[in-house]
Curated annotation (Swiss-Prot):
Keyword rRNA-binding: no
Family annotation (Pfam families): SLT
Region (Disordered): 197-238
Similarity comment: family membership: Belongs to the virb1 family.
Protein known as: Type IV secretion system protein virB1
Length: 238
């Protein structure tokens, strides 16, 4: 296990790790297999590399636009970095691509806003999300803008990340240790279904350009969805 901030320093050295962590928190909730589909939302997120690759291939075959991986890199950016789907779901490789995209956005923003480091950084967040310096600042009724979400995540993701918890004495030294809960297996090894009428309660936030489908020919999988994006203080990447 590698703490996220350590991974970010190794794989995305040109971006402050706390900044990268804030983006990842909003984009994928630190899920390396996350897929966001433009115009829809997956019924649930893939829970394994094989399932993520199969889902991406299925979406591509059906002509969908989507972003993938821990930093939600858009599928059309993969050829630019010589990346396959399998590589894009590798946290380090995905962070490297995401950091390059953000760095390019920031370099262009600081030229337009000389001496305004934080202003340029926020403009770069918008660029990362929407492909321009304004789209990420737009809000929807009852929802903050993408840039506001990223900035708000900074306070959360900069807290210390605990890899191994502190040992605590139990009242009874002979207390039984709870057996680990056995995870349910995916209903099948096919692609995850896509919902063309997404609700606002599912899926991580994704960008429109670097952005989030139920395939009508299939039925939704019955497997429980993986945990959401509440992975903050104890974030680790396997």
């Amino acid at each position: 296990m590698v703490p996220f901030l350590v991974l970010a320093q190794q794989c995305a050295p040109t971006v402050a790790p706390q900044t990268m962590a804030a983006i990842v928190q909003v984009e994928s909730g630190f899920n390396p297999y996350a897929i966001g589909v433009v115009g829809g939302r997956l019924v649930r997120q893939p829970v394994s590399l094989d399932e993520a690759i199969t889902t991406a291939q299925s979406l591509e075959a059906k002509g969908w636009n989507f972003s993938l991986g821990i930093a939600q890199v858009n599928r059309y950016n993969l050829p630019k970095y010589g990346s396959t789907y399998a590589q894009a779901f590798d946290p380090c490789k995905n962070l490297k691509m995401g950091s390059k995209i953000l760095e390019d956005c920031y370099r262009r923003a600081i030229v337009k806003m000389p001496g305004q480091e934080q202003g340029a950084l926020r403009a770069a967040f918008s660029c990362y999300y929407a492909g321009n310096f304004t789209g990420g600042f737009k809000t929807k009724p009852g929802s903050p803008s993408y840039v506001q979400k990223v900035v708000a995540s900074a306070d959360v993701t900069t807290k210390p990340i605990v890899v191994v918890p502190m040992i605590r004495k139990t009242p009874d030294a002979a207390a039984a240790v709870a057996a680990p809960v056995k995870k349910r297996q995916p209903a099948d090894r096919n692609s995850v279904l896509v919902d063309l009428h997404p609700s606002s309660q599912s899926m991580p936030a994704t960008g429109a350009a670097n952005a989030p489908v139920r395939l009508k020919t299939e039925q939704p999988a019955t497997t429980d969805a993986p945990p959401g994006k509440d992975n903050t203080d104890g974030v680790v990447v396997f």
